[in-house]
Amino acid sequence: MDNGIFIVATIFVVNILYVTIYTVRLLLTMKGYRYLAALSSVFEMIIYVVALSLVLDNLNNIANVLAYAIGFGVGIIVGMKIEERIALGYITVNVITKEYNLDLPNQIRDLGYGVTSWLASGRDGERMMLEILTQRKNERKLYKHIIEIDSGAFIVSSEPKQIHGGFWVKQVRK
């Protein structure tokens, strides 16, 4: 009986490890970190074979299958949490101010961000549009700064596929 619980726990933990590595490896691949992704795939496959063999060798126990399935789901969550922490890549943050007369671009520049700004027309009049490129790990901090300066600002971010040119392009990993 103790051996059965040990196998269920092992399947659960090993599958969490497998799917966590799988999720991070997939994100590394999408971000262009091919060598790191390839290296992580080696560990991913070793762990996968171990987990799958434990389930297939003990297929008569439904708890093993459930441990595998639940470990898979938990592994996805853990992998996504890890990816959020390491926050690879860059984002483009677009801001539409509530009022045009704000000195938001200079205040954001003073914080070390590159800002391009221009006049925009909204439903209720003139607005200022800003475009800011920053590392993903700085996204929450940037949002906080913008909201402190203009709590009514409309903010949306997206992930650029390629970056070329600009005053800090040499800092951006190609």
From Swiss-Prot:
Pfam families: DUF2179, DUF5698. It is found in: Cell membrane. GO terms for cellular component: plasma membrane. It is a multi-pass membrane protein. InterPro entries: DUF2179 (IPR019264), DUF5698 (IPR044035), UPF0316 (IPR022930). Keywords: Cell membrane, Membrane, Transmembrane, Transmembrane helix. It comes from the Bacteria. The keyword Cell membrane applies. The chain crosses the membrane at residues 4-24, 36-56, 62-82. Its main location: membrane. The keyword Oxidoreductase does not apply. Belongs to the UPF0316 family. This is UPF0316 protein LMHCC_0787. It comes from Listeria monocytogenes serotype 4a (strain HCC23).
